[in-house]
């Protein structure tokens, strides 16, 4: 029997999922994306060579692996083809191994225009989107006016639907946001041109995944962003527009939830966040600067500097619960090397000094103060360590304390950016 494993971020994204997905892909024949869009950035370092993927699953770099983009992913045809061409320029075969769900909502130029016009109008109150049209595309999906990849199989139908939806959005762009209208004919011509290249890759993704399961294949589901950015369970409204948690795996791929065997939570040894939104353990001091510089904390998609802070065990425990996580992968432990003291947030208090849990809205987060526990740091390097025994005792104590606080074991430890710099204590596919 094969195993079906989900890889998710437990924080606000940028936890290092790309490397771990790439590592685990050596044990699978199928990899699937199930939510998000090209707002996600997966950075892989293989034999010292850096590759950044935004839409295509990381498994594409492994020959013999079939990659799927499920119905929960919002698809920008131009961004996808750009990524395909870039991989093909590196002599990576893509088209015969990449399968696309016809139910993927399309991101088209008017979605991008709306996204950027909205952020501009919000001014200092902006949410901090990537400006790539993700939110507006999901809105169209929920309002049932959105165009889907399968519509491109029928040119006349696509043209009629496109005209109708563009009249609606251009009215908002010009009359409310004071922006320029998006040209209908230009959008139509480009979409139909791209459709010719995309059509051969369109398949029933749900059916293909179940056939693979029935054949006893190992399947990996690759999450994007992080659990604290989930549209329902994250720090609303400073969240993404999709379900980044384990429940999104089933709805975003058509794969039955009871067929999932293991949920791996990728967790940074400290905390980072890109853009606006609550961040109780944020450090605006030398330690925060140390984490940012040593951790190279710049977004793979936007290049924006990430905010940094101590490990938040309260938030991660919340992520463990809502995802029913089986085990954790701890990344970037080496960034803490050299610190005399490391802190962990073990609780929240409000301004009245009362113990509180995870708030459900941004206003509730504003009244949060972290409660810290301090542990000794370590001066020795953890970079490239191949076993737990090779880690400094203080680092091992830190890991053990994190396990106790969040309620699951650390099954994998990443000790550097290359996939060989990894300690596997328990394989999700074992």
Swiss-Prot record:
NCBIfam families: PRK01117.1, purA. Mg(2+) binds at residues 14, 41. It comes from the Bacteria. Its EC number is 6.3.4.4. PROSITE patterns: ADENYLOSUCCIN_SYN_1 (PS01266), ADENYLOSUCCIN_SYN_2 (PS00513). This is Adenylosuccinate synthetase. The active site is at 14 (proton acceptor), 42 (proton donor). Homodimer. Plays an important role in the de novo pathway of purine nucleotide biosynthesis. Catalyzes the first committed step in the biosynthesis of AMP from IMP. One of its GO terms (molecular function) is magnesium ion binding. Its cofactor is Mg(2+). GO terms for cellular component: cytoplasm. Binds 1 Mg(2+) ion per subunit. The keyword Iron-sulfur does not apply.
